[in-house]
């Protein structure tokens, strides 16, 4: 997993191409999945065109992350289609907005969302997080996982040999 800040995805993909990573993906030597986390700005959307040349042999997911009340150009079909329909085979994932207070408390607790929802601390010890905030987090996680299921995310990241091994176990 590689996590790059906004604006560096094209540069990172260029470097991966130059070191042979993309060629290895093309030969099925590794699984290449790109999660392109989009902001609601045109600059964020412009990067879609820039990276399309690098994602031909990848499972490519355009992720609309609703960290606030933005609309991602849903109000303007022409703008929306000019970006989101540009890349053949791209899947769109929508991460819904999480209640701000719940999100803040998860960050303050320094635990994964799943741990917060399960009322577990950083070392899996029992915690005393707010019942209501845990409820918001669990509900939000359910929506996120439903999105992953909708786009069949596991089919993109689990290779056929891994599926065979899992079936035999």
Identify the function of each model-found stretch:
Residues 1-4:
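Conserved nucleotide-sensing/catalytic segment adjacent to the nucleotide-binding pocket
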Residues 7-106:
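Conserved catalytic-core segment of NTP-binding enzymes
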């Amino acid at each position: 997993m590689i996590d790059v800040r906004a604006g560096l995805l094209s540069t990172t993909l260029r470097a991966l191409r130059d070191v042979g990573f993309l060629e290895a993906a093309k030969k099925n030597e590794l699984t290449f999945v790109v999660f392109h986390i989009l902001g609601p700005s045109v600059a964020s959307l412009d990067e879609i065109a820039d990276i399309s040349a690098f994602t031909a042999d990848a499972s490519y997911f355009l992720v609309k992350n609703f960290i606030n009340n933005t609309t991602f150009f849903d109000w303007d079909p022409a703008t929306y289609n000019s970006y989101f329909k540009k890349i053949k085979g791209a899947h769109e994932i929508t991460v819904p907005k999480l209640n701000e207070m719940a999100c803040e408390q998860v960050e303050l607790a320094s635990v994964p969302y799943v741990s917060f929802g399960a009322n577990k601390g950083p070392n899996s010890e029992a915690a005393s997080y707010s019942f209501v905030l845990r409820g918001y987090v669990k509900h939000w996680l359910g929506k996120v996982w439903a999105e992953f299921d909708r786009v069949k995310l596991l089919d993109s990241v689990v290779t056929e040999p891994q599926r065979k091994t899992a079936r035999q176990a």
